[in-house]
Amino acid sequence: MASSEQAEQPNQPSSSPGSENVVPREPLIATAVKFLQNSRVRQSPLATRRAFLKKKGLTDEEIDLAFQQSGTASDEPSPVGPATPVVPVQPPHLISQPYSPGGSRWRDYGALAIILAGIAFGFHQLYKKYLLPLILGGREDRKQLERMAASLSELSGSVAQTVTQVQTTLASVQELLRQQQQKVQELAHELAAAKATTSTNWILESQNINELKSEINSLKGLLLNRRQFPPSPSAPKIPSWQIPVKSPSPSSPAAVNHHSSSDISPVSNESPSSSPGKDGHSPEGSTATYRLLGPQEEGEGVVDVKGQVRMEVQGEEEKREDEEGEEDEDDDVSHVDEEDVLGVQREDRRGGDGQINEQVEKLRRPEGASNESERD
């Protein structure tokens, strides 16, 4: 009874909408087929079976299909004994007392094997997709972590080496910078010392130049002072009374022309190169003026003309010797000028009586020489 009640319970929810559905319900039909194939159910009359199936919620079409599929539509119970009142027998539930012929068992075993294979396959896939990655993933993670730790240790070692190298390079660079700074300071000191020495040398050179300039100026002054005074005669002079006097020849045109211009008293014997404006010296002592007497003054006194000429020649020679050290070109010009002056003076002397005033001779000679000439 309990099994029949359990079979009725799952079929009750589907019995209510059974009459309304037009399409046959295959699960109910299959259950009815199994129910009809039961040996005990076959012994029951057909009407009882139909009534029981209708009670379970199957329609007439479904019941007919179930009878056709089960092959029990023509089964009728055979009468064994006398007619006895028919007692309705409650059919047992299919699951509680299944009909187990040989074919159905193998089908059940096959279905069970398929179900077990599906479950095993599901477990295998679950294990492969989820459990195995978790297990292997942990191992891979461990290996990856180990590899990462090894790489980190290598990196830390390389970083430490690079840091030490950088520190050594920085120390060497700092040392080089310090050396360069020392060299720069030394160069700066050397430059300062060189500047100081150059400045002192320049000051000393300027002082030496100033000293040389002062010495040159003093030498110039000495030379100029030397030229301001007439030189003393070195050669002895002939007395005036021993010098023969020649009368001027009337045929010389220079004497005639000079007699006409004998009233000109000053005559300069200096050359243009020895002029006071050119040399930059004072005209005192560097110029020589001569006063020649005309025909009116010839009778006033007798003068030694040759002595005067000798004095003039000596003075010109001394001047020429002084000027030879300075400029050679000026010497040549002075020679020409001196010869011209001497020629002119000789021509002037030819026109007179050969005597010049004694006072002019005293001015051109030193005191000792004038006294000697007077004694003679």
Curated annotation (Swiss-Prot):
Bias (Low complexity): 244-276
Organism listed in the record: Rattus norvegicus (Rat)
Compositional bias annotation for Polar residues: 1-19
Molecular function terms, GO-annotated: beta-tubulin binding; identical protein binding; microtubule binding; protein transmembrane transporter activity; protein-macromolecule adaptor activity; signaling receptor binding; transcription corepressor activity
UniProt subunit comment: Interacts with PEX13; forming the PEX13-PEX14 docking complex. Interacts with PEX5 (via WxxxF/Y motifs). Interacts with PEX19. Interacts with tubulin.
Protein task: Component of the PEX13-PEX14 docking complex, a translocon channel that specifically mediates the import of peroxisomal cargo proteins bound to PEX5 receptor. The PEX13-PEX14 docking complex forms a large import pore which can be opened to a diameter of about 9 nm. Mechanistically, PEX5 receptor along with cargo proteins associates with the PEX14 subunit of the PEX13-PEX14 docking complex in the cytosol, leading to the insertion of the receptor into the organelle membrane with the concomitant translocation of the cargo into the peroxisome matrix.
Acidic residues: bias regions: 319-341
Membrane topology summary: Single-pass membrane protein
Feature: compositional bias, Basic and acidic residues: 359-376
Localization of this protein: Peroxisome membrane
GO cellular component: fibrillar center; peroxisomal importomer complex; peroxisomal membrane; peroxisome; protein-containing complex
Pfam family, one: Pex14_N
Record PTM N-acetylalanine, positions in chain: A2
Name this protein carries in UniProt: Peroxisomal membrane protein PEX14
PANTHER family in the cross-refs: PEROXISOMAL MEMBRANE PROTEIN PEX14 (PTHR23058:SF0)
Region feature (Disordered): 1-23, 70-93, 230-376
Stored InterPro entries: PEX14, Pex14_N, WH-like_DNA-bd_sf
N6-acetyllysine PTM positions: K34
Keywords, alphabetical: Acetylation, Membrane, Peroxisome, Phosphoprotein, Protein transport, Translocation, Transmembrane, Transmembrane helix, Transport
Ranges in the topological domain labelled Cytoplasmic: 127-376
Modified residue annotations for Phosphoserine: S232, S282, S334
Annotated family: Belongs to the peroxin-14 family.
Regions of this protein lying in the Peroxisomal compartment: 2-108
Membrane-spanning ranges: 109-126
Subcellular location, principal: membrane
